[in-house]
Amino acid sequence: MAVIGAPKGHNRYRDPKTFQMTPALYRVRKPFFWKNFAGFFLVSSIPLGVYLYTWNVLSKDEFADIPIPPISDEELAKLKKEYESK
C-alpha cells in the first residue's frame, strides 16, 4: 500500500535544517491572518476595558471622608524607631 503525504519525521511546512517557515506555510497561514488578528483584538479588548474602567473608578475615589485616628507622641517615636532600624 502506498504512503500518501510526507515521510514520517518530515514536516513539509518547516525547513528540516533551519526549522524556518517555508513558503507553503506562509501560503497556508495567509487567509487566517486578519481573522486571527480581529479575534485577538476582541479577546484582548475585554480585559483591557475592565482594567481601564477599574482604574478610572478607583482614581476618582477620595479618602477625605475616612478619619485618621490621632497618634500619641510616644507611639510615633516607637514607630519611627522601628522604621529606621530596618
Swiss-Prot record:
Protein family (similarity comment)? Belongs to the COA3 family.
User: Any keyword Transmembrane?
Assistant: yes
Any GO BP annotation: mitochondrial cytochrome c oxidase assembly
Which InterPro entries has this protein been placed in? Coa3
Kindly report every residue range on the membrane side named Mitochondrial matrix: 1-32
Q: Transmembrane segments in this chain: where?
A: 33-55
User: What does the function comment of this entry state?
Assistant: Required for assembly of cytochrome c oxidase (complex IV).
Q: Where in the cell is it found?
A: Mitochondrion inner membrane
**Assembly:** Component of 250-400 kDa complexes called cytochrome oxidase assembly intermediates or COA complexes.
* Membrane topology label: Single-pass membrane protein
Which GO cellular component terms, listed alphabetically, does the Swiss-Prot or TrEMBL entry include? mitochondrial inner membrane
The name of this protein is Cytochrome c oxidase assembly factor 3, mitochondrial
Q: For side Mitochondrial intermembrane, which residue ranges?
A: 56-86
Record flagged with keyword Zinc: no
Key words of the record? Membrane, Mitochondrion, Mitochondrion inner membrane, Transmembrane, Transmembrane helix
Name of the encoding gene:
COA3
